[in-house]
Amino acid sequence: MLTIFIVTATLFAILYLYFTRNFNYWKDRNVVGPEPTVFFGNIMESVIRRKHLIMIYKDIYEAFPKEKVVGIYRMTTPCLLLRDLDVIKHVMIKDFDLFNDRGVEFSEEGLGLNIFHADGDRWRVLRQCFTPLFTSGKLKNMLNLMSDRGDKFIKMVEKICDKEPEQQIIPLVRKFTMASITTCAFGMELDEEMIETLDKLDSLIFTTSYGNEIDMMYPGILKKLNSSLFSKMIAPFFDNLTKTIIEQRGGKPTNRKDLMDLILELRQKKAIEPMKKTHDEQVTTLELTDSVIAAQTFIFYAAGYETSASTMSFLLFELAENPDIQEKVIAEVDETLKRHNGEITYDTLSEMTYLTQVFHETLRKYPVADILLRNAKADYAVPGTNVTLKKGQTVVVSGFGIHYDPKYYPDPEKFDPERFSPENVRNRHPCAYIPFGAGQRKCLGMRFGQWQVQVCIIKLLSKFRFEPSTKTMSEF
């Protein structure tokens, strides 16, 4: 019995020492931060799914208002949370070549080689390849597709509201974003079977796994094990869908000008070379195979579907809670559409300046893509501090923390679109608003996402007004 006790106690002692081995890292370097918990570091509530990680980082951000940087532990791995906007600007923009990797490595198989998750030269090739696809000129062609889906969406909403005017918003607007994304990406008309398939797929895409936590504890292990962050059921769907569409189009672009068309135009160039070689990376080319194309269409769908729907839902919630703002938006929508004969064009959207301010204030208050991660590619002396990051270490930026910092946004809980008037934007630090990221890894599809939200809101406000119901949640 005594032997069992000694063995058990020894085992626990060894495990304790192992899982706390790094927990003096920041203290030894005189970097302040919250006390870590054994095994979990500073993210225990996220690991046990009690609290979202974005809220944990926001709480840490707010707990150290005088610090430029804060030492934290993602599981057992030391990382640095950046608070100072000038430091963030250095990392994200000025010294970008040293921080162009997100640092979450996993298998390139099964959709892993997408532009969001790719790092190093792979990312550079993809970025150079796909940036021209998301210019205003290219995306203008998709506005007609969005607007057409918006008209069909409104007819559906009218039928639903005729039966019951009190509706939960998020399921409704998801129907629009699903239809908009699939037509703009794949040229697809949704039938009931496809809607059911996509609904099941969405539950897999947006269900959190423990892959991130495993990577935090053992950086790079997912790639070594050829494992992915995504369910194995997701890749076959996008692979098959991509191959089917390419075959239907004879492997060549049509005149539809959707995302698949633009990608097929790129594929006619056969291979794309990176712009330049940096550090010890190897210059490579990347062939746009069906699987590479599938990975890009997957991330386009995943990034544009739920984020846009959530933003629309939050925006309409705020309009319902602030009827004076809603009336101002409706007046602008009505007047602008009248000038443009009811058509939603690039010029129509450009002239709806107040709606644009409302959109940005929504993303300030509800930043759906919040946490920014970057890996140091070399030892790095953090500007304005005595801290040196070691090669391979990760920095974390809390967009939520910044967006709710009263230093940049007085009375941050208040919904105030005037924060994004041209004058206020000019007078604010460029890194004080980062819902799409910052620097060269800023979201490529941000303009598409903004237009998609605005088109849907314009269509809805042309027909309806929104009011809180007795079931409306006062807080999200």
Curated annotation (Swiss-Prot):
Topology of the protein relative to the lipid bilayer? Peripheral membrane protein
Cofactor(s) this protein cannot do without = heme
Quickly give the catalysed reaction: an organic molecule + reduced [NADPH--hemoprotein reductase] + O2 = an alcohol + oxidized [NADPH--hemoprotein reductase] + H2O + H(+)
**EC numbers on record:** 1.14.14.1
Listed GO CC annotations: endoplasmic reticulum membrane
Kindly give the InterPro entries that the UniProt entry links to this protein.
Cyt_P450, Cyt_P450_CS, Cyt_P450_E_grp-I, Cyt_P450_sf, Insect_CytP450_Detox
Molecular-function GO terms, alphabetical: heme binding; iron ion binding; oxidoreductase activity, acting on paired donors, with incorporation or reduction of molecular oxygen, reduced flavin or flavoprotein as one donor, and incorporation of one atom of oxygen
SUPFAM superfamilies according to UniProt: Cytochrome P450
- Primary location group: endoplasmic reticulum
Enzyme kind, highest EC tier: oxidoreductase
What keywords is this UniProt entry annotated with? Endoplasmic reticulum, Heme, Iron, Membrane, Metal-binding, Microsome, Monooxygenase, Oxidoreductase
Q: Where in the cell is it found?
A: Endoplasmic reticulum membrane; Microsome membrane
Query: What PROSITE patterns does the annotation carry?
Result: CYTOCHROME_P450 (PS00086)
Task: Keyword check for Cell inner membrane, yes or no.
Answer: no
What is known about its induction? By furnocoumarin.
Q: Where does heme bind?
A: 443
* PANTHER family, per database record: CYP9F3-RELATED, CYTOCHROME P450
Family label: Belongs to the cytochrome P450 family.
Describe its function.
Enables the insect to feed on furanocoumarin-producing plants and evolved as an adaptation for detoxification of xanthotoxin and other furanocoumarins.
State the name under which the record lists this protein.
Cytochrome P450 6B5
Q: What is the lineage of its organism?
A: Eukaryota, Metazoa, Ecdysozoa, Arthropoda, Hexapoda
The gene it comes from is CYP6B5
